[in-house]
Amino acid sequence: MDTVSAFKLEVRADKIAVITIDAPGEKMNTLKAEFGSQVRGLIRQLRDDKSVRGVVFISAKADNFIAGADINMIARCRSAQEAEALARQGQQIMAEIHGLSIPVIAAIHGACLGGGLELALACHGRICSDDEKTRLGLPEVQLGLLPGSGGTQRLPRLIGVSTALDMMLTGKQLRPRQALKAGLVDEVVPQAILLQAAVELALKGRPTSREVPVRERVLAGPLGRHLLFQFVGKQTQRKTQGNYPAVKRILQVVENGLAHGCSSGYAEEARAFGELAMSPQSQALRSIFFASTDLKKDPGAEAGPGSLRSVAVLGGGLMGGGIAYVTACKGGLPVRIKDIQPRGINHALKYSWDLLNKQVRQRRLRPVERDRQMALISGTTDYQGFAHRDVVIEAVFEDLALKQRMVSEVEQYGGPQTIFASNTSSLPIGDIAAHASRPGQVIGLHFFSPVEKMPLVEMIPHKGTDPQTIATVVQLAKRQGKTPIVVADKAGFYVNRILAPYINEAMRLLVEGEPIEVIDNALVKFGFPVGPIQLLDEVGIDTGTKIIPVLESAFGERFSPPANIIDAILKDDRKGRKNNRGFYLYETKGRKSKKRPDPAVYPLLGIGRPQSRLSAQQVAERCVMMMLNEAARCFDEQIIRSARDGDIGAVFGIGFPPFLGGPFRYMDTIGAGEVAAILQRLAAQFGPRFTPCDTLLRMAEQGTTFWPADERLT
């Protein structure tokens, strides 16, 4: 049976050929290997039909042009040569599109990313819709790759090298007006007239080459290019610590093409694509992509979700304000905030207003849209209107009696359908539900701060939580733009439990005399976005350490921090960035906030003159191995449902280095035997807290892995 083509060609009366892209049976258009022959067939038709005056590519999908290449194509490659051949095939198809003698225009609505933008770049002109869904970018670097179908050569020549590098090295996506300003598109029009505008552009003949700004022309010259690549190279090295080889290869490939011409650039691009596709960093980053994609489809429970029409939030503090914002502004759901004080409600409303107003100032949101979203959020000091709320999210103080009272009151004033979701970070959900009349509708929903930025939520059912409750709250989290993982109702849940030993070990290194910045820099070099001590400052020392006694009580001495260190810091009123003094001092100059280690911390903790005695590798090893050992325990105790969930939880929740794929993929890469051996060596040097858990010893003996063998390469 013939495969249904994703490309349909129709020639209009005005002799403009419209190629409609519609991948059969798919919500998103993604470029697949078999599409190559389909496009080539259309190009042959266009060459043969001399009456055709121009071509327009447009998508039949509701919200995407082409969202990129099908990543599974790369996963199926077993060598750099296979991946290089894949890139060359893409380059050849784009060259054939660009080589047509008649004007070819891309009419873009929705996501135009990766291979989709490379196809648009191969066209002679581009028009996009002014819709909020329209985004243009080359995000391959986020998968440890580079654009492999000509993007590294065409983009710099179209918009200038510095702007192109910014897009490719960061994966930044441009909105319609940004794309127009950059010269990436020729026009921005309402979606309703997108096709007509593209046809009119095609009828005018090939668009004339856009003049690149003077600054970009200077940077494209030999001297300017040398200085630019030298500067950007140093900047990216500082940001990536050399952990992401794709950024270095992007710089090399772009520079090669500018210095030696497109032919050399295309050859180098394909070669680099092949190398990067086989790199462990890209394989790890692609595993994160596949895992997060799987989680988006995971309903969380076998039951179907209940209705989800409106939500309430208890508490107008930092977390409550953030939860209200993502519920209304990301999820589009009406939210009512309850606080005992009007100022708490006002604080939460201001939180959303400030975030929305910032988007208005940045021209990412129209004032009328800001006002519409704000209208979804209301406040109350009583339970008026709670009978109609499907989910009530509690974000009050970490006090068990208070949370139990909240459950009782919500059951009294809410409807029979109302779910109670607690944002606790430390209290057992079973205890919170202990006196509930409808315990099946009580669940934990642990957000991370700041709520609007952190992508993860932990979903914590207790033993009596109904499957429908789980499914409903998972659906809510997805509407809020979050990635939910379901974790067991045990002390610390998952993320805080693996984070605490890591933080504690950093504190021990500090007490031993390692300077604050040396510890943090070592973990940044390892691949974390910030070091453990700075992380504590960012979260808030008072907030971040509340979980430690809970974990110490549940699991014993291995969770004990160095004696009195936290008490001494808190008694000196050091809370971190929020009061401008923690382990670091913070000062704001203009729009920039600067931090520096506070030397007064050392005498406060009874530390003499700090002096670095360990290498960055030794510092990182001690902190990371404590985290890995605890993650293995969580896996064994079924705190997480799978290695997939554990990796996503660590990467999205605490910034575990994505290029390592998460703690479980990292342990699989180096081997359970090696992890156990390192822990045994550290235990002999520093004490029994490093003793490898039984799970690691058993896996080392059996030669098994956390990830199933058939999932390790996807």
UniProtKB/Swiss-Prot annotation:
Keyword Oxidoreductase appears in the UniProt entry: yes
GO CC aspect terms: cytoplasm
Region (Enoyl-CoA hydratase): 1-190
Keyword annotations from UniProtKB, A to Z: Cytoplasm, Fatty acid metabolism, Isomerase, Lipid degradation, Lipid metabolism, Lyase, Multifunctional enzyme, NAD, Oxidoreductase
Subunit structure: Heterotetramer of two alpha chains (FadJ) and two beta chains (FadI).
Functional description taken from the UniProt entry: Catalyzes the formation of a hydroxyacyl-CoA by addition of water on enoyl-CoA. Also exhibits 3-hydroxyacyl-CoA epimerase and 3-hydroxyacyl-CoA dehydrogenase activities.
Protein name per Swiss-Prot or TrEMBL: Fatty acid oxidation complex subunit alpha
Lineage: Bacteria, Pseudomonadati, Pseudomonadota, Gammaproteobacteria, Enterobacterales
